[in-house]
Amino acid sequence: TAANADSKPYATIAGIKAVQSHLDRLGLNAKVEQARRPFTYKVTYAVPDSHPLVSIIIPTKDHADILNNCITSIVEKSTYDNYELVIIENNSTEKVTFDYYDKLQAKYPDIVRLVTWEHEFNFSKLMNFGVAHAKGDYLLLLNNDTEVITPNWIETMLGICAREDVGAVGAKLYYPDNTIQHAGLCVTGGVAGHLCQSMPRNNWGYFALNDAQQDFSAVTAACIM
């Protein structure tokens, strides 16, 4: 027995080696590290050697300040550099919004493309319209009211998404008050519901599930690759 986890660092090292060996045997290019909670492990999958283009597709209507926060956080914080921003304009009416579009395209002509959806709001049709204008190898759907807080978010999602056995990858999202907005969806009885919603951001949850990569029934389209 031990008073705390730090008393047996060799156990943590052994755990890392065990998980790393498993991934190596599977032929997966990934690195294993200790996660925040003792005896839990973080796996970072390598980005494909082709350094693929990621199309970030963002639907928006007015509220230029909100969109600006989103775009600025992507451009200033993201460490992955091969991406494009497909902005879907959906029936905005405010002049400040269209002025912002002009400034945005002038400032980032190589990565920003504005497309206009002239029909009534329908999320599925709206996003499919944006996808039709995307040039990337991978698609990342993103709400305009989100803000990047983790610099390596694109490559982290991309590394997982590039695996042949993965269909889609979501992200852990927080409300402004640092509580959990999204940490995966569970479908029970034909109804989808958020897991651990409104729990404190740093709450690990049952068996540290709030802090671990795992399979879910679904993930929110607010941020999905």
Residues of each region from the PLM?
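A recurrent flexible, glycine/aromatic-enriched loop bordering the glycosyltransferase active site
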Residues: 124-125, 132, 188-225
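N-proximal low-complexity "stem/linker" segments adjacent to membrane-targeting elements
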Residues: 8, 20-76
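Acidic donor-binding segment of Leloir-type glycosyltransferases
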Residues: 75-116
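Nucleotide-sugar-dependent glycosyltransferase catalytic core
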Residues: 1-17, 180-190
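A short, glycine-/small-residue-rich helix N-cap motif at loop->alpha-helix starts
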Residues: 118-126, 131-134, 148-149
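Conserved donor NDP-sugar-binding/catalytic core segment of glycosyltransferases
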Residues: 147-190
